């Protein structure tokens, strides 16, 4: 009689369980990575605003940023940078669509609209606020604790 070599049912169930466990850990890492990436994008927006302010002061030219629900684009000198938001980044409210800094680094008034104001974001269940102060143009990034 020939003896057949094969896996037992218990061995197969254990192997499938281990594989499923490893796959679920990988799925959790992707969710965490997306949250971190979304938060970093909001921080990058605040840093880009600070960069625009400083660039306009140093080079004595106007700089601007256009903000939308999908992302933003900045114009400085002859250069343009466009950033598309992560799907987790949600622009909740803002009184700014276009932000312009004068050649002295101050928020300018174009078409009777101020470039100073507040931008509110949410990433999953966390909220962030970016403020631009009216006279000085100082940019603040605040994580709102609930």
Please report, for each region that a protein language model flagged, where it lies by residue:
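N-terminal helix-rich module
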Residues: 21, 25-35, 39, 47, ...
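N-terminal single-pass transmembrane signal-anchor helix
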Residues: 1-30
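A generic structural signal for short
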Residues: 7, 40-41
């Amino acid at each position: 009689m020939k003896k057949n070599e094969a896996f037992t049912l218990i061995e197969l169930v254990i192997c499938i369980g281990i594989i499923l466990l490893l796959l679920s850990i990988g799925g959790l890492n992707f969710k965490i990575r997306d949250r971190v990436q979304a938060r970093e994008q909001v921080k990058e927006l605040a840093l880009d605003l600070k960069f625009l302010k400083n660039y306009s002061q140093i080079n004595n030219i106007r700089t601007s940023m256009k903000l939308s629900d999908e992302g933003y684009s900045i114009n400085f000198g002859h250069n343009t940078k466009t950033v598309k938001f992560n799907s987790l980044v949600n622009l909740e409210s803002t009184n700014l669509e276009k932000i312009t800094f004068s050649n002295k680094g101050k928020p300018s008034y174009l078409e009777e609209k101020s470039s100073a104001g507040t931008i509110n974001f949410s990433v999953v269940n966390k909220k962030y606020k970016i403020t631009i102060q009216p006279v000085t143009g100082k940019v603040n990034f605040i994580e709102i604790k609930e």
